[in-house]
Amino acid sequence: MPHATQLYQHVPEKRWPIVYSPRYNITFMGLEKLHPFDAGKWGKVINFLKEEKLLSDGMLVEAREASEEDLLVVHTRRYLNELKWSFVVATITEIPPVIFLPNFLVQRKVLRPLRTQTGGTIMAGKLAVERGWAINVGGGFHHCSSDRGGGFCAYADITLAIKFLFERVEGISRATIIDLDAHQGNGHERDFMGDKRVYIMDVYNRHIYPGDRFAKEAIRRKVELEWGTEDEEYLEKVERNVRRSLQEHLPDVVVYNAGTDVLEGDRLGGLSISPAGIVKRDEVVFRVVRAHDIPILMVTSGGYQKRTARIIADSILNLHDLGLIGPEFPCVSAQNSGIPLLSCAVP
């Protein structure tokens, strides 16, 4: 019997399946500026969407913090106890001065925002199944597994969202993860190693962190990119492999890890995708998945430049303008849309 949770409560129809909380953003005495990650990007995305009149506060779903019981669905108690040591959190977040902070401050100022984003991903999973789509304007902590964190990822939100669906939602027994962050998603790969219910497609720069050879064994469709890969090659590989993934394993839900660290100039991602290329990438994924009438959950994952918030907002606006998301969502396929994809042929 699943435990009682606050994350699977009813959401009124008037609210769009876009999940966010002001508590996502990490701010504490400027320490967040010591990491290249823009630790306030999530709020900036929402502000841009409000400025464009797409959303108001009353249309958003307020994320709730994942409880310890929620986290124990995936995480070991030993790992959660390790997070009570500031030096462990400093290592995971890659912000060395965190080691000198009392852990109660680390819990409140660093881990609580990450737990709230994790709760948001779990909530968005249920919403995606109910509404056909959902976006958590946060989450995507794809380097964290049940018993280890790293790369700014302290909680395994993708694994948690899928396991919650498997345990609590009738008819959800197969999932596909489409991970398009610039880095290999070794966390969910370790968690779902050997689990035939979960198909993982991962497109990443082969030369950068984490280089987890063991975790790569869980990838069913692996696309390794070279330094400086640009739009044309990238978009062709993404579309072709998304199509093939859905042919090989037709899931009940897709979790799309939409990292923007593929952006040109991102010194950690090492790829050269333009802002327009990222917007097109997200469009391609949504259109192909929705053409199969499969629910899709998008999380925003990595992105290490100040302009990534604007790009994420532009992508969400584009999905709305094309009718791929909205309050009354129509299933739009490449065939009945006036806006072409890349070539639909699969060689």
UniProtKB/Swiss-Prot annotation:
Role according to the record: Responsible for the deacetylation of lysine residues on the N-terminal part of the core histones (H2A, H2B, H3 and H4). Histone deacetylation gives a tag for epigenetic repression and plays an important role in transcriptional regulation, cell cycle progression and developmental events. Histone deacetylases act via the formation of large multiprotein complexes.
Disulfide bridges in this chain: none
Active site: H143
Histone deacetylase: annotated span: 14-318
Assembly: Interacts with HDAC6.
Sorted UniProt keywords: Chromatin regulator, Hydrolase, Nucleus, Repressor, Transcription, Transcription regulation
Taxonomic superkingdom: Eukaryota
Reactions performed catalytically: N(6)-acetyl-L-lysyl-[histone] + H2O = L-lysyl-[histone] + acetate
Pfam families, per database record: Hist_deacetyl (PF00850)
GO BP: chromatin organization
EC number: 3.5.1.98
CDD domains named among the record's database cross-references: HDAC_classIV
Species name: Mus musculus (Mouse)
The protein, known as: Histone deacetylase 11
Name of the gene this protein is made from: Hdac11
GO molecular function, one term: histone deacetylase activity
UniProt similarity note: Belongs to the histone deacetylase family.
Location of this chain's protein in the cell: Nucleus
Miscellaneous section: Its activity is inhibited by trapoxin, a known histone deacetylase inhibitor.
InterPro entries, A to Z: HDAC_classIV, HDAC_PDAC, His_deacetylse, His_deacetylse_dom, His_deacetylse_dom_sf, Ureohydrolase_dom_sf
GO cellular component, as recorded: cytoplasm; histone deacetylase complex; nucleus; plasma membrane
